[in-house]
Amino acid sequence: MLYLLYEWLARSQEHLPALNLLKYLTFRSGMAMLTAYIVAVAMGSRFIRWMKAKQGKGQPIRTDGIARHVTEKAGTPTMGGFMILAGLFVAALLWADLRNVHVWVVLLITGSYGLLGFMDDYAKVTKQTTAGLSSVQKLVAQFIVAIIATVILILFAPKSPMTPGMETSLVFPIFKALVINLGWFYVAFAAFTIAGFSNAVNLTDGLDGLAIVPVMFAASTFGLIAYLVGNYKFADYLNLHFAPGVGELAVLCGAIIGGGMGFLWYNAPPAKIFMGDTGSLALGGALGAIAVCAKHELVLGIVGGLFVAEALSVMIQVAYFKKTGKRVFLMAPIHHHFEKLGWPESTVVIRFWIVSMILAFIGLATLKLR
């Protein structure tokens, strides 16, 4: 909104020189981060009190899991993702270029998945059960929205004449010449990336602060990636494909970081509120959509390797148990396995943060290793 105001004033004779700052992505990304942080922190205390009053017993805690969680975390309200999403959307409306197709595609995914997560959280809280919507219901809804968003990108996102067909191509990291055009099969691949990463973040959100910090690391990494591939000079220097308009997603990444910091203010151990599916599904979907827009889907698997590992641990556990009746891990997702081994919750969380930070640096390194 402010960016559009700047462009309107720039065409007149009344604009102030200070408004020229608005044309810089770096400035708007920083302001988006600050705005989202302020919104999340400002609404935090009142929102938490309201959620406690509305939810009563708070988020249901698994009774077959870590015993101390039942006593330590009982009564903690959920749906804290609303704080992050409020900051994200306010910041996006203020600082992003609202004519940009990529911005609206990411907001479509984020808002839709946030609504789906809210429905899941609401079902859990009202029924006081850890089972909300069925997995099939969530997956079908996620894939439908992701397919629609991907088709919009393919048809309407700006294209570079230097890289025809890139909108349906899969770009491999490190190997700069390895690009495979999947045609319309790319729609299924992109939808899987978005929905899969959304659920991976959701599975990781099981301990205080565990998911949100790796989300911020991933958002920082993809904010830089989006900025680079959206700038022809940087993309050419680094031998990256040029993706017109994708740089604007750096603003949304800044907003995710700011909203995440504001949420972490209240989610730091002992958590006063949980993110819930409202936040985890939305943020995972947002990162998946940003990776698709930037054509760095495979790099997301590296940067978000912690989330991928959490999801794989669940799939391995379920598949192996169905086949043999035995478990590979003491408990899945894998962060609970380490708790069962005797690691304190804070140790698990901080070590997982370290792993996610290392993976983020490795993901960034692929930009230069070509």
Curated annotation (Swiss-Prot):
Disulfide bonds: none annotated. Keywords: Cell cycle, Cell division, Cell inner membrane, Cell membrane, Cell shape, Cell wall biogenesis/degradation, Magnesium, Membrane, Metal-binding, Peptidoglycan synthesis, Transferase, Transmembrane, Transmembrane helix. It is an enzyme of class 2 (transferase). Pfam families: Glycos_transf_4. Pathway: Cell wall biogenesis; peptidoglycan biosynthesis. It is a multi-pass membrane protein. One of its GO terms (cellular component) is plasma membrane. The chain crosses the membrane at residues 24-44, 78-98, 103-123, 138-158, 177-197, 209-229, 245-265, 273-293, 298-318, 347-367. Signal peptide: none annotated. Its cofactor is Mg(2+). Belongs to the glycosyltransferase 4 family. MraY subfamily. This is Phospho-N-acetylmuramoyl-pentapeptide-transferase. It comes from Caulobacter vibrioides (strain NA1000 / CB15N) (Caulobacter crescentus). The lineage of its organism: Bacteria, Pseudomonadati, Pseudomonadota, Alphaproteobacteria, Caulobacterales.
